[in-house]
Amino acid sequence: MTPLVGAQTTVLSLQNGIDAAERIGKVIGVDHAIGGATWISSALEAPGVIKQMSQFRRIVVGELSGGISPRVETLVEAFRPTGVTIEATDDIRKILWTKFVFISSASSLGSLTRLPMGEYRAVPETRAMIVSLMKEVMAVAHAQGIALDADVVEKSLAFIDASAPHIKAS
């Protein structure tokens, strides 16, 4: 990929996790990488055909170093006509960890139970388990110096509760 990166190239990482953009930056140069988080539910329907499984589609982007740069603003403007809700943040690391509280817990519980969110959210024991998982990830974030909002667990649970019953976390 490095030979394709020019002076004006920007690569946006929308991968789940907390360090994908940093890893990309190590390969192509940190000045070319932008961090991002996305909330979307989709499934591979056939080779090359991706089906959106819900109405939510949100992207948050930001510079790894913090702040909102002109290239982040340009990226946001480029996405606007697509119908995807997109916003810039001056603290992408906080956003990535906030999503990680949700995705790591929901994905782990989905893998363990082999159930969609609608089924495991309704069982008191698995609901308690997801809260415990979220609090553990939140503690790791705090240990890494990331100041997450105090209500991140409650907001993550509200997102799960508002999701269609058949949705699975990736």
Model-inferred region functions:
Residues 161-170:
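Short, intrinsically disordered, charge-balanced linker/junction segments flanking boundaries
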Residues 153-161:
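Long, charge-rich low-complexity segments
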Residues 1-49:
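Rossmann-like NAD(P)(H) cofactor-binding subdomain of soluble oxidoreductases
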Residues 3-4, 27-32, 47-150, 154:
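Internal alpha-helical scaffold of NAD(P)-dependent oxidoreductase catalytic cores
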Residues 7-8, 82, 163:
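Structured helix-beta-strand junction loops
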Residues 42, 95-96, 157-158:
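Short secondary-structure capping/turn micro-motifs that flank functional sites
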Residues 9, 69, 169-170:
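Serine-centered coil/turn micro-motif
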